[in-house]
Curated annotation (Swiss-Prot):
HAMAP family given in the database record: Ribosomal_eS1
UniProt feature coiled coil, ranges: none
Gene Ontology BP, a term: translation
Protein name (database record): Small ribosomal subunit protein eS1
Keywords (A to Z) from UniProt: Ribonucleoprotein, Ribosomal protein
GO-annotated molecular function: structural constituent of ribosome
GO cellular component, as recorded: ribonucleoprotein complex; ribosome
Amino acid sequence: MVRGGIRDTWRLKKWFKVVAPPLFGETVLGTTPADDPDKLIGRVMETTLFDITGDYSYVHVKMYFQVVRVEGDTAYTRFKGHELLRDYIRGLTRRKSSKVTGIFNVWTKDGYGLRVTAMAFTRQRCKTSQKSAIRKVMQEIVEQKARESTLDELIQLMVFSDHEGSLAYLIDESARKIYPLRKVEIAKSKLLWVPGPNGPEKAVVVSPLQLKVT
């Protein structure tokens, strides 16, 4: 076995610190190795809102951030989306009750497009017409608040669901007039579009290495 000719690529790798966006105080999300900083561009980091805030009540909120640039030994990210743990959602589901789901594409006032999934859990099983009415309330609130908010403001309205004025809070406040609710959550979000020089662009992060002509 020839060992002399084997290149130890691991030793050539450098460790980079990955940080959250300014909205989350550029909290360190972790470290990752790479032999070329450009290879980090587009990489997705997964964490929980608990890891970012230190608040255990958010341990069920998964957060996704994507590396958009590297400066020195620090990789900077932007929000890519969030999702509640499946076990948490499963725990909210009850027999003889209804789950109402609404999926909406919305735009923020600073030009970002997102897909937002809202869920409401009723105390008892409700009628189809009541589900439709609740879903309509969801849509009106999610779309309106998105139009009135920047991306950073909307992120906070989505993920901090227990805060007064959050999307979940506002939906619960209005929809419970239609039928008694047990819980409302913004179960998922995904960044789809970002502002560009010539209008909205797909939220796709391309590494410079992919742009090089081989």
